[in-house]
Curated annotation (Swiss-Prot):
InterPro entries the UniProt entry points to: Palmitoyltrfase_DHHC, PFA4/ZDH16/20/ERF2-like
MF GO annotations: protein-cysteine S-palmitoyltransferase activity
Topological relation to the membrane, as annotated: Multi-pass membrane protein
Location of the DHHC domain: 132-182
Keyword annotations of the record: Acyltransferase, Lipoprotein, Membrane, Palmitate, Transferase, Transmembrane, Transmembrane helix
Presence of keyword Chloroplast: no
Compositionally biased tracts (Polar residues): 385-403
Region (Disordered): 365-403
Originating organism: Caenorhabditis elegans
Gene Ontology biological process terms from the UniProt entry: protein targeting to membrane; synaptic vesicle maturation
Pfam families: DHHC
GO cellular component: endoplasmic reticulum; Golgi apparatus; membrane
Stated name of the protein: Zinc finger DHHC domain-containing protein 4
Record localization: Membrane
Amino acid sequence: MSCRDCTRKGGCVYTTFWLVRFLPVVLVSLATGWGIYAYTYELCILSIDNWPQRIIYLFIFYALLILFYTSYLRTVYTKAWKPPQKYCIEGASKATYESVKDDERQLQLFLSDIARERDLTLLVRGFDHGIRFCDKCCCIKPDRSHHCSMCEQCVLKFDHHCPWVNNCVNFGNYKYFILFLAYGFIFCIWIAATTLPSFIDFWRHEYDMNKKQYDSIDSVIQRNLKHLHTVLSNGRFPLVFLLFLSCMFSLSLSFLFFYHLYLTAKNRTTVESFRAPMIDGKYAKDAFNHGIRANYREIFGSHPLYWFLPVPSSIGDGCKFVMNDMTAMSAAAGNQVFVEMGNVPNGQSHAHPPIAQHHINLYSEQSSSASEKEIKSVDDEITERSQVSTATTASPSHDSVTA
């Protein structure tokens, strides 16, 4: 087997790399499994004697566990959404692409023709103000999509590639990702809050017992070491470690959770927060911001029943997005955007009169006919001038020949 075969899909190097990438998912699952044992047995069975309290603790624990781990699995196993087939260059179009790909101007003309023929909605432009194209996937990039080097494909509404879920966070699983962060944060807070009182009670009890044995001031260090040894040797180490893990994970999850709440409120992705999308030759960081309520509805859906459940309810198809009114008017003022007024899809609400769709087509019917008329008038003028110039030049020559 050659080195090239090893690096291909199914090869030994590729398989090893895939297993390493999946390691964080295994670690999260192992930590969750160990937490189930520690909370159920070490805390609820060994440390809590009150049956009603034990039942309440276990009921809330397992309810949060189901919501947390289901959201996590949906985030992990929901495949990243690819651009639809109509954005891809295939067949005869592929041959044309191969012939013009080295000439940027011809390539943009070719992509513009494809976008017009297939009625593609393209609001976001590249830094060169041209249509964004992925030469690896050989497809026109839909708005807000990007190529993921880890997944080796273009991904719709790409947010980031998260190693802890071994998947791209994108349009297809962004709701699950936020629910995973939310329930993970609440889950860890609940574990820490319910473990801490039992741990403190046990610590104080053992400390008082050791204090009677070591009363002299000179034996303070010895008393504390004995106390720590008692705590660990009496089976309390799982409780200590559970408290430590829950505090650590709740702290780390809180940063991610509240950051993505902010991004959702602004209708931005992580990529867009660092590099604003370019629309009409300008960076528009709030191009898709329609207000907090509408932005959250776009992610979680219109039905409150589905907001807190890891089930699909997001609005849209991941390709077409609605610009806010200010961005649309700014773009229209530059005569580069053609705006079609209508109803906001899927029940989205806005503070201002809604704009349902904004099409940027370099070769729309209106612009094409206007360009053709302008070109025809210029051609007629050039023809007229050339005829006059020819007649003027030819007259003296004719007179001299006659003479």
